[in-house]
Amino acid sequence: MSQTHKHAIPANIADRCLINPEQYETKYKQSINDPDTFWGEQGKILDWITPYQKVKNTSFAPGNVSIKWYEDGTLNLAANCLDRHLQENGDRTAIIWEGDDASQSKHISYRELHRDVCRFANTLLDLGIKKGDVVAIYMPMVPEAAVAMLACARIGAVHSVIFGGFSPEAIAGRIIDSSSRLVITADEGVRAGRSIPLKKNVDDALKNPNVTSVEHVIVLKRTGNDIDWQEGRDLWWRDLIEKASPEHQPEAMNAEDPLFILYTSGSTGKPKGVLHTTGGYLVYAATTFKYVFDYHPGDIYWCTADVGWVTGHSYLLYGPLACGATTLMFEGVPNWPTPARMCQVVDKHQVNILYTAPTAIRALMAEGDKAIEGTDRSSLRILGSVGEPINPEAWEWYWKKIGKEKCPVVDTWWQTETGGFMITPLPGAIELKAGSATRPFFGVQPALVDNEGHPQEGATEGNLVITDSWPGQARTLFGDHERFEQTYFSTFKNMYFSGDGARRDEDGYYWITGRVDDVLNVSGHRLGTAEIESALVAHPKIAEAAVVGIPHAIKGQAIYAYVTLNHGEEPSPELYAEVRNWVRKEIGPLATPDVLHWTDSLPKTRSGKIMRRILRKIAAGDTSNLGDTSTLADPGVVEKLLEEKQAIAMPS
């Protein structure tokens, strides 16, 4: 399919869309030319305790990066997601939970969710948790994860959700960095029929001598299997919630009070604790949810993301619940126990809006018609894609097979740091091109710049930057504002640098080309090459390592690691397995290298810098243009690496 082919806006969408093409142009112009008026109006999507007078107060200036929105307003996120819906829609389903086992599912109304959140808020207060304290949440995909997050927001505690796939070492690092006082977990998680030892991982993390801030661990009973128990520290969820009062008055929070920390991989060193605040974030999550998914009251919405990622925060929970929507939470995986599981869930719950990742789409695509076998999917109206650029072939398959050629695909580009959608179609306003994220959302001013920071006009390619602030933008990195400025605002002055490259076509549509820094995107999850390299080098037999990403049909990118062993050590199949398991234990299963390339030396400049550009090309099998190798200390290394590469079995 030609990249210039446009999919027209379907008549059934055009007839009742919230934003049509003319409205998009008008509103977008206003949002750029007069952000105070535009976002002042959009802020009314929420209920405020103290209405704001100021809207935007932001600076991207070097040495003075400061981001404030609605700074004199007060509100409570949980009240906006729950309390305000009770009078008219208290009996509406807030969360549909679909278990890993298809025989397990339940509907939780707004009234029931409100009661549970109030009880858990009182539980937190009884344990001495107060406004500003950090609570670590390491939970499976169960409604109690949402209860824990909303209860933190209700009392003004800051939540730090840790993805359930992370290792004890990764958990410990996040607890130490944020000084979390409490950990909320479950005995085990369940995924694709297998149990995940969540409590054991937390126990192991808390054995780290540098973890000194944690006072209690609240444990939800999910599987009921035996776990270790530390009397006094460990507390059962049910015991606490049963004796807690269902009455709780939400805390008035300033719009700029911290809401959550979410750790994301950086290209250097330890993961970064991205900090989002309350008001601007929720305005942005709710506004983007409403317009991008063309949400109408009564729609059943399903975002397949885990709560441990920003998508789970903004578009599984907070955006939908702020809008009074019914959101589906799925414990399992899209292709287990059958390739048609995702479509079976769509039919079972009559899902209207489906938001998933290219990785899932490609995995289902590989199954062919088995992915849709015996399913109807006629309830679907809007499809969405998130986590990484979607290749046109997968886009077309998704549109054709899952959506039966009648559902617009909103391919959303955004990041943990942006809080919400940045470049995305609006279903009733923008014609679609397979593989393009299309146009910017309201208030978002993207630009493409060359490596010197000069803006590139017209149809071109370059580094993707944003030239002015938006309400959902992260305010800082927890405890390290200097690193925040250094990471996002130092490469190009007075601009937010996304770390992604993009091209813009003759219609002004954006095509994301992927990371330009040393961050990998594996199955929609960001992993820093530095973090994986550090784990490899920590192995007693490894001298040096360099990690690059290679294209992978299902995961988007696979992890290719060049490894130099210590003098006297020899490669072996046993060591290969040992090293892969080592990384798995250090970081988590996601970071396990797909390929280990044993080598005696790496291509380095005379100053000792590893030439990653060359390593990327060799790993990808692209040897046509290795570029200038004259700066290498030993140009012969490249030939040797190419020879070694011939013998390596690549992942399919």
UniProtKB/Swiss-Prot annotation:
The modification N6-acetyllysine is found at residue 609. It catalyses: acetate + ATP + CoA = acetyl-CoA + AMP + diphosphate. One of its GO terms (molecular function) is ATP binding. Disulfide bonds: none annotated. Acetylated. Deacetylation by the SIR2-homolog deacetylase activates the enzyme. One of its GO terms (cellular component) is cytosol. Its EC number is 6.2.1.1. Mg(2+) binds at residues 537, 539, 542. ATP binds at residues 387-389, 411-416, 500, 515, 526. Its cofactor is Mg(2+). It holds the Pfam family AMP-binding_C. Keywords: Acetylation, ATP-binding, Ligase, Magnesium, Metal-binding, Nucleotide-binding. One of its GO terms (biological process) is chemotaxis. It comes from the Bacteria. CoA binds at residues 191-194, 311, 335, 523, 584. Belongs to the ATP-dependent AMP-binding enzyme family. Catalyzes the conversion of acetate into acetyl-CoA (AcCoA), an essential intermediate at the junction of anabolic and catabolic pathways. Acs undergoes a two-step reaction. In the first half reaction, Acs combines acetate with ATP to form acetyl-adenylate (AcAMP) intermediate. In the second half reaction, it can then transfer the acetyl group from AcAMP to the sulfhydryl group of CoA, forming the product AcCoA. Enables the cell to use acetate during aerobic growth to generate energy via the TCA cycle, and biosynthetic compounds via the glyoxylate shunt. Acetylates CheY, the response regulator involved in flagellar movement and chemotaxis. This is Acetyl-coenzyme A synthetase. It comes from Salmonella typhi. The gene is acs.
